[in-house]
């Protein structure tokens, strides 16, 4: 078409109008647009043109947005792309305000119809009525919404998309008004359809200026908008897109216009700043960026306009001072480095700035908490740990009470994370810091302490099933606060939460005892408003929730009694209690114990509760005796059924005289005549009680007990299947009774038929019970105790045993094995721990081990070894198993170790002994924390603690280290033959000599422990009968030793054995081998080992210099050592020189040659000058003494601690003194801590070192945080960024980390386009870790591998020069002379093989980066950076 300007010049107005009319009829709207834009012609007054344009545009929009079919959805699942004609019509609307006005009304009706039909679906009831409806009411006022019009079925998203295009074209002109549309569109930001809300939010990008203008000119509209935005944020708590839309609108408004009156009013409220803080602490990165930009813009606008503001979180006067703005700049910089572009190095450098934020007078404390919170939620563990350390270093504790939700939802839960609770020695540093933190937090709070305490208790309830130690240390912090400040703060609200805490159970007893004791001690600090009944009901709740036990409450009764006297008025308390007495037996008992309440009805249930409580209350003793007498009669009054009657036997005032005076004959007669399980269990218990005081309890015989079994069996079989616990308990009582009976009754074994004697009858009964009648936990436990008693009492070990004894031992072992295999097949249940331990005691009874060692029973030793290995492996995560197994082995070795024969293969026994000693145990926090928490309970919570009464030993028995001490005892008890076999077999059959995996730390530790046993065996053997073959294997193994710790023990072992060879006159083969190592410097480590061995041998032989070849060895050694001191191998040279520091003082008296003496003395003088003391010791410190260090503490870790700073297992003097039995063979030794090497401190950053950072140090930031505000509409902002025409084709690169790095550097250097083979790589975690957020801004395009050639050809047509980054024979050097064409395309090759030949042929040239080193190629990221930077320097 001829240009619009010519038409306007040569055609008259009428012709122009006619031409436009014809063009409209022919759908040539693009030409119409050109004419209108170039012509001064005013067509708004001509309805013949205006109306057809409106109709054409609406026709196009209807066609674009129409939904086919009968479906009544608001939008289609897929939409067509907007064509050129629609874009043209959108531009026409912007040029024709009158047409736009009609179109706006038309569009408003269309949108209103869709929304009206789907109103309940789009908006929640309350939000829709109160917040959204006023918009539609305003629309109805301005436009008569009731006018009849055609209801079209259109796609709302298509309509909004079209409006977005209109607003986009109008953004610069601002020529159209759309207020009536705004009443419809703005509420859609808060609709329940994310797609619609997101579409409206995008539309607002181009329309925000007009909206802001309306807000500043129309107060009603302004109020309507900001009321909606405020409520939209609150509404979005469950639908995140609503909050995002609220923030996006606010940010766009701040960017686009002046503050409106209603926005200023909103800003002056705490809610505005609280919303910003909430979003700064949001887990979503985008929300954080939005909130930070809103914060910066708000402060900048407030300061520039001189607005006075006084809120809780932000305060400023008319003119914000420079210091205040500086404080906010510092905060935003710190926030960016912690929460957005996280960098640990920057955070560490800004440590003091972060800490001082909490003391900044211009910033409310809660802003500092935001920094901590976001840091503690970082994806980088190192940052989380550092921020946790920072949090504990804050001294202004009042800051934490300024935002309780943040404290209890983020900060404290983060501090309770399990991975922080590491154990260092015998303490948990993080746990102690957490307790101190909570204590200080409460101590420094002057107001609202009740609220803080309530929130922390509420957190404990929410975390009731979480990591137990974290709850313990948090609770302990509260308790310490109470104890130190004597505050009576616990009120009724707190008690309701404490009662909920009682409902949670810890994983096992050490943790449960500790945490329940803490919770119970909280009650000692109740507020005066708490009544006596409320206190007791809380205790009742605890007792009932813990299954009726008083074991946690009982140690605190004395404290509660003191509380009752000091805290309550006696008359008021008893008046308060009276109304509740008689309603609950436990309550009545507590009233009696704590408040000395007398007026109580003494019932049998009450007396049983007294017995369970273990409280000495003499006033009830007579009634308890009366009740006991009634029970003993077999016919108690009031129809009592013996349920729970066994608890009465623990009545604290029942003394020895009580038990001596009672008669159980009537009870026994009643049991036999009127049998019931409860009565029988009562009889069994009382029989055991009376047995402890006298032996003539009742005349029972074996047949009576057999009859009782049948009664128990008959009664148990009548129980329902669900009552298996009742049956199990009954059988348990029976076998406990039988066990007690056998202690005073010798079984008759004089039957003519061996299988019919009483012992065999009893064994058959046991077999029947295990296999048929019961086989459950309590019954099996009692059976195992009985079998253990039998084997202990009826089987005697001697050189000859009867067939019957063999049968009995085999039978009992098989029963133990059967039960063990049954429970092990279903995994060991923690609550059945007593049975596990009883089985280990039984399986490894010394008698059974003796029968195995003498091979009396076939396959016994193999089964023993199998069970032992199972137990050893289970002990990795379970306590008590290993110490018991070790103790059983020790008992066996103590009595029978000297009797073990030389001609028997004891590998099974050796394998068990070594397995027990070397078995590692769990290294996780919870496992290591239990002894630490037990110690906390003993020393801080147990009012009656005395040494030897540790909680840990009550629950688990002896420490796990007992297992190793028991094995050491076992070796000491063994005869020489077994020790020699142990050395030979362990070096032959295990990995002791050669590691399976040289870099496996766990294996190295186990090998180290094996060598400790080997050394102990060697040094305690009197007859040195170790075979030469074994010794040669050990000697040669030192050449292949990868572990420096194991090498120490090999050196020690070899040195000791070589000394023996010299003393027996046969040292030649060992000496020659060692000197071959000394002279071969190709392996310096082994030269050092040989020097150590020779030196230690010489020291041991020096007192007998005239014997054993001492002089010859000394001469030969010095002749080798002196040249080694000048070796070209640094390790050999340094060690040889430092060894002379020890050699000269030790052996100078034995050097007679004058020249040699001068040489050694000079070497000694020079070595002394370079000797370094402290952490890094000279070579002489790596030598120990064969005789002086022959002590248990040195053999089991002490020498290692003196010669290396590695972590290594160590058994201390106190442990040996406590657990070792055989103390006469080898001295225990002492803990020579002054000689131990300290661990090198690798922590170069210490938070407590507050003086390192200077107050004036600048904060490092990558982006200028204060000046930079997030441009929300990144498509538009990305267009503003100046980018070059350079294209980087990285489609051949396939590693996500490399692509992430290339993407980041391309964005930094302003590359125009980057291609990748699969655009989905942007979502790969490794790509994101390196690219950070560069993929959001960097223009990227997917070009598959098979499309690279065609893509480059297309770019060639556009004038691009195709350049390959590759080394070829025709490559051009990248130097100062090379000039890049402005339109350059750079093709990157694969990481391994470069650019394929098929693509090389398509290139115009190849560039090669000049290289001057040895390596031929560089990393693809580095190469790309070099070439792209070279281009950028020339063209940007």
Swiss-Prot record:
tRNA processing listed as a keyword: yes
GO molecular function: RNA binding; tRNA (guanine(18)-2'-O)-methyltransferase activity; tRNA (guanine) methyltransferase activity
GO cellular component: cytoplasm
Chief place of localization: cytoplasm
GO BP terms, alphabetized: cellular response to oxidative stress; tRNA methylation; tRNA nucleoside ribose methylation
Alphabetic keyword roster: Cytoplasm, Methyltransferase, S-adenosyl-L-methionine, Transferase, tRNA processing
Deletion phenotype: Increases cellular ROS (reactive oxygen species) levels. Increases RNA level of TRM7, TRM13 and TRM44. Sensitive to oxidate stress induced by hydrogen peroxide and rotenone. Mildly slows cell population growth.
Pfam families reported for this sequence: SpoU_methylase
Binding site residues for S-adenosyl-L-methionine: 1365-1367, 1389, 1409-1418
Cell compartments where the protein resides: Cytoplasm
EC nos: 2.1.1.34
Disulfide bonds: none
Catalytically driven reaction(s): guanosine(18) in tRNA + S-adenosyl-L-methionine = 2'-O-methylguanosine(18) in tRNA + S-adenosyl-L-homocysteine + H(+)
Keyword Coiled coil: no
Class of the enzyme per the UniProt entry, highest EC level: transferase
Additional information: Present with 861 molecules/cell in log phase SD medium.
Main function: S-adenosyl-L-methionine-dependent 2'-O-ribose methyltransferase that catalyzes the formation of 2'-O-methylguanosine at position 18 (Gm18) in various tRNAs.
Family recorded in the similarity comment: Belongs to the class IV-like SAM-binding methyltransferase superfamily. RNA methyltransferase TrmH family.
Protein name, as recorded: tRNA (guanosine(18)-2'-O)-methyltransferase
Provenance organism: Saccharomyces cerevisiae (strain ATCC 204508 / S288c) (Baker's yeast)
């Amino acid at each position: 078409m001829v240009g619009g300007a010519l038409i306007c010049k040569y055609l008259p107005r009428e012709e122009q109008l006619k031409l436009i009319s014809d063009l409209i009829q022919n759908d040539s709207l693009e030409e119409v647009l050109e004419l209108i834009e170039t012509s001064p012609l005013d067509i708004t007054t001509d309805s013949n043109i205006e109306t057809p344009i409106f109709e054409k545009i609406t026709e196009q929009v209807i066609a674009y947005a129409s939904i086919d079919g009968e479906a009544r959805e608001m939008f289609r699942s897929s939409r067509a792309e907007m064509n050129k004609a629609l874009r043209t019509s959108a531009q026409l609307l912007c040029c024709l305000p009158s047409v736009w006005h009609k179109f706006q009304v038309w569009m408003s009706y269309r949108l209103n119809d869709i929304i009206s039909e789907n109103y309940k679906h789009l908006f929640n009831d309350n939000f829709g009525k109160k917040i959204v409806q006023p918009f539609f009411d305003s629309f109805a006022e301005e436009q008569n919404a009731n006018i009849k019009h055609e209801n079209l079925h259109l796609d709302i998203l298509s309509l909004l998309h079209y409006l977005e295009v209109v607003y986009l074209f109008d953004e610069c002109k601002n020529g159209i008004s759309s207020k009536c549309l705004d009443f419809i569109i703005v509420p859609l930001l808060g609709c329940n359809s994310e797609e619609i809300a997101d579409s409206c939010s995008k539309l607002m990008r181009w329309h925000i200026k007009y909206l802001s203008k309306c807000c500043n000119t129309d107060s009603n509209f302004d109020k309507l908008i900001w009321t909606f935005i405020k409520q939209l944020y609150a509404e979005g708590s469950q639908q995140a897109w609503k909050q995002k839309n609220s923030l996006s609108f606010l940010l766009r408004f701040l960017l686009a216009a002046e503050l409106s009156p209603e926005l200023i009013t909103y800003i002056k409220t705490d809610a505005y700043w609280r919303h910003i803080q909430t979003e700064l602490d949001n887990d979503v990165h985008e929300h954080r960026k939005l909130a930070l930009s809103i914060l910066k813009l708000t402060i900048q606008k407030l300061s520039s306009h001189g607005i006075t503001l006084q809120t809780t979180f932000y305060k400023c006067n008319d003119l914000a001072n420079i210091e205040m703005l500086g404080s906010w700049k510092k905060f935003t910089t710190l926030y960016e480095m912690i929460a957005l572009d996280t960098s640990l190095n920057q955070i560490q450098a800004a440590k003091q700035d972060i800490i001082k934020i909490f003391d900044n007078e211009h910033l409310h404390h809660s802003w500092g908490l935001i920094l901590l919170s976001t840091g503690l939620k970082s994806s980088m563990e190192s940052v989380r740990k550092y921020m946790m350390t920072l949090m504990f270093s804050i001294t202004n504790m009042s800051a934490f009470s300024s935002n309780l939700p943040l404290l209890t939802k983020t900060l404290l839960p983060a501090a309770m994370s399990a991975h922080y609770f590491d154990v260092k020695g015998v303490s948990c540093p993080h746990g102690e810091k957490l307790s101190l933190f909570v204590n200080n937090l409460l101590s420094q709070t002057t107001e609202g302490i009740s609220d803080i305490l309530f929130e922390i208790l509420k957190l404990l309830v929410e975390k009731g099933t979480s990591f137990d130690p974290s709850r313990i240390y948090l609770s302990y912090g509260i308790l310490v606060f109470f104890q130190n400040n004597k505050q009576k703060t616990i009120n009724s609200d707190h008690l309701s939460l404490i009662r909920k805490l009682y409902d949670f159970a810890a994983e096992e007893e050490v943790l449960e005892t500790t945490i329940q004791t803490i919770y119970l001690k909280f009650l000692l600090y109740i507020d005066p408003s708490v009544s006596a009944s409320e206190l007791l009901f809380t205790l009742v709740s605890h007792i009932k929730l813990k299954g009726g036990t008083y074991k946690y409450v009982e140690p605190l009764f004395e404290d509660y009694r003191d509380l009752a006297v000091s805290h309550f008025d006696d008359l008021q308390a008893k008046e308060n209690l009276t109304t509740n007495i008689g309603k609950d037996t436990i309550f009545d008992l507590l009233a009696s114990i704590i408040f000395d309440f007398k007026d109580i009805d003494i019932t049998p249930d009450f007396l049983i509760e007294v017995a369970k409580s273990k409280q000495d209350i003499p006033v009830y003793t007579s009634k308890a005796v009366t009740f006991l007498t009634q029970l003993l009669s077999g016919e108690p009054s009031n129809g009592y059924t013996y349920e729970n009657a066994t608890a009465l036997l623990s009545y604290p005032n029942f003394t020895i005289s009580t038990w001596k005076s009672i008669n159980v004959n009537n009870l026994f007669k009643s049991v036999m005549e009127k049998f019931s399980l409860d009565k029988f269990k009562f009889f069994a218990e009382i029989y055991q009680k009376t047995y402890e005081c006298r032996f003539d309890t009742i005349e029972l015989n074996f047949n009576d007990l057999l009859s009782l079994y049948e009664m128990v069996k008959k009664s148990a079989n009548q129980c329902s299947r669900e009552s298996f616990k009742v049956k199990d308990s009954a059988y348990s009582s029976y076998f406990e009774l039988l066990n007690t009976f056998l202690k005073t009754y010798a079984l008759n074994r004089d039957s003519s038929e061996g299988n019919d004697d009483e012992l065999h009858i009893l064994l058959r009964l046991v077999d029947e019970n295990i296999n048929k009648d019961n086989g459950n936990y309590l019954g099996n436990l009692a059976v195992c105790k009985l079998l253990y008693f039998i084997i202990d009492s009826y089987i005697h070990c001697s050189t000859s045993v009867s067939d019957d004894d063999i049968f009995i031992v085999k039978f009992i072992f098989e029963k133990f094995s059967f039960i063990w295999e049954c429970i092990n097949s279903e995994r060991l249940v923690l609550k059945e721990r007593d049975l596990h331990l009883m089985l280990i005691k039984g399986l490894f009874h010394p008698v059974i081990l003796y029968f195995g060692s003498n091979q009396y029973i076939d396959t016994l030793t193999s089964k023993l070894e199998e069970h032992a290995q199972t137990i050893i492996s289970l002990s990795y995560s379970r306590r008590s198993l290993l110490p018991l197994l070790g103790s059983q082995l020790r008992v066996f070795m103590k009595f029978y170790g000297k009797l073990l024969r030389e001609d028997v293969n004891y590998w099974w026994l050796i394998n068990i002994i070594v397995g027990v000693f070397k078995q590692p145990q769990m290294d996780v926090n919870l496992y290591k924390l239990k002894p630490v928490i037990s110690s906390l309970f003993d020393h801080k919570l147990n009012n009656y603690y005395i040494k030897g009464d540790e909680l840990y030993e009550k629950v688990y028995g002896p420490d796990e280290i007992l297992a190793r001490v028991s094995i050491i005892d076992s070796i000491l008890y063994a005869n020489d033959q077994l020790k020699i076999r142990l050395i030979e077999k362990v070096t032959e059959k295990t990995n002791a000599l050669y590691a399976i995996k040289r870099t496996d730390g766990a294996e190295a530790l186990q090998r180290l422990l094996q060598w400790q046993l080997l050394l102990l065996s060697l040094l305690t053997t009197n007859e040195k009968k170790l075979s030469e073959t074994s010794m040669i294997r050990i000697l040669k193994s030192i050449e292949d030793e990868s572990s420096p710790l194991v090498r120490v023990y090999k050196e020690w072992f070899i040195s000791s054995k070589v000394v023996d060879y010299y003393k027996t006159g046969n040292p030649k083969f060992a000496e020659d081998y060692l000197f071959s190592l000394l002279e071969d410097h190709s392996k310096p480590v082994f030269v050092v080992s040989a020097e150590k061995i020779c030196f230690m041998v010489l020291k041991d032989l020096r007192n007998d210099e005239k014997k054993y070849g001492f002089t010859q060895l000394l001469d030969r050694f010095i002749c080798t050592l002196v040249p080694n001191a000048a070796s070209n191998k640094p390790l050999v040279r340094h060690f040889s020189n430092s060894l002379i520091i020890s050699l000269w003082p030790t052996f100078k008296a034995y050097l007679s040659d004058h020249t040699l003496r001068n040489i050694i003395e000079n070497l000694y003088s020079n070595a002394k000058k370079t000797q370094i003391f402290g952490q890094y010791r000279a070579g002489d410190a790596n030598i120990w003494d064969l005789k002086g260090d022959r002590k248990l503490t040195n053999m089991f870790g002490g020498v290692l601690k003196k010669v290396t700073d590695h972590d290594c297992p160590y058994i201390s003097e106190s442990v040996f003194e406590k657990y070792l039995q055989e103390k006469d063979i080898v001295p225990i030794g002492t803990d020579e801590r002054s000689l131990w090497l300290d661990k090198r401190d690798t922590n170069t950053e210490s938070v407590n070192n507050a003086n390192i950072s200077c107050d004036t140090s600048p904060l490092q930031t990558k982006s200028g945080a204060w000046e930079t505000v997030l441009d929300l509409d990144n498509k538009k902002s990305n267009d503003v960024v100046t980018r070059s025409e350079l294209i980087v084709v990285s489609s051949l690169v396939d590693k996500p980390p490399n692509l992430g790095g290339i993407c980041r550097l391309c964005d930094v250097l302003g590359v125009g386009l980057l291609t990748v083979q699969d655009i989905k790589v942007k979502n790969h975690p490794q790509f994101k870790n390196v690219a950070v957020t560069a993929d959001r801004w960097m223009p990227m395009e997917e070009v598959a591998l098979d499309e690279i050639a065609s893509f480059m050809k297309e770019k060639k047509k556009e004038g691009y020069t195709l350049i390959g980054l590759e080394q070829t024979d025709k490559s051009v050097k990248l130097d100062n002379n090379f000039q890049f064409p402005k339109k350059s395309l750079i093709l990157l090759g694969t990481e391994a093989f470069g650019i394929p030949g098929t693509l090389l042929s398509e290139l115009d040239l190849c560039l090669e980066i000049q290289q001057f080193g040895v390596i031929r190629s560089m990393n693809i990221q580095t190469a790309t950076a070099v070439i792209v930077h070279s281009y950028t320097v020339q063209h940007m």
